[in-house]
């Protein structure tokens, strides 16, 4: 009888029991992405950011939101020159956000045939989290401005490597 009751409850509320914790420890239903009113909710990204990454310097320039998108040009440089250039586009799709990124070599040839595609999983006043949905995409990518105006980028790559990057406004 207990087994039947448990199965019955789960069949009535299949998504009720599927919950994950976001960065603030709050639980939310994993079956639905957070709703976004406007791409302007990401206005805090706008500006030029720079900081160390390995032996080089990572620079990001974020353009103001316009036309349901916000976009960035990213460049990694070191003593030898430019390692790569990356384009990032975050677009409001329906009531959520989709991030697409692609890396390019020095001749501006894409390093991958298709861009990485990531979908919104969490958004706050000065933070946003995406999960990879395309083949070869990062598992997770988050951006956050902390209380000291540091731009925190956190990545979990497709193979599970964790990368932490902190940039300052320039």
Q: Which residues does each PLM region occupy?
A:
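Bacterial N-terminal signal peptides
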Residues: 6-15
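Central antiparallel beta-sheet cores of small beta-barrel/beta-sandwich binding domains
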Residues: 52, 56-134
């Amino acid at each position: 009888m207990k087994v039947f009751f448990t199965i019955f409850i789960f069949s009535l509320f299949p998504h009720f029991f599927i919950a994950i914790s976001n960065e603030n420890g709050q639980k939310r239903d994993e079956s639905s992405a957070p709703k976004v009113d406007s791409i302007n909710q990401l206005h805090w990204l706008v500006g030029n950011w720079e900081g160390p990454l390995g032996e080089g310097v990572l620079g990001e320039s974020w353009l103001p939101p316009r036309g349901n998108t916000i976009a960035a040009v990213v460049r990694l440089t070191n003593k030898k020159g430019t390692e790569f250039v990356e384009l990032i586009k975050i677009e409001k799709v329906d009531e959520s956000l989709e991030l697409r990124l692609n890396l390019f070599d020095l001749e501006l040839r894409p390093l991958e045939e298709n861009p990485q595609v990531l979908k919104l999983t969490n958004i706050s006043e000065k933070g946003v989290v995406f999960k990879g949905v395309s083949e070869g995409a990062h598992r997770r990518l988050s951006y956050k401005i902390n209380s000291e105006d540091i731009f925190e980028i956190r990545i979990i790559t497709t193979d599970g490597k964790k990368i932490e990057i902190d940039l300052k406004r320039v």
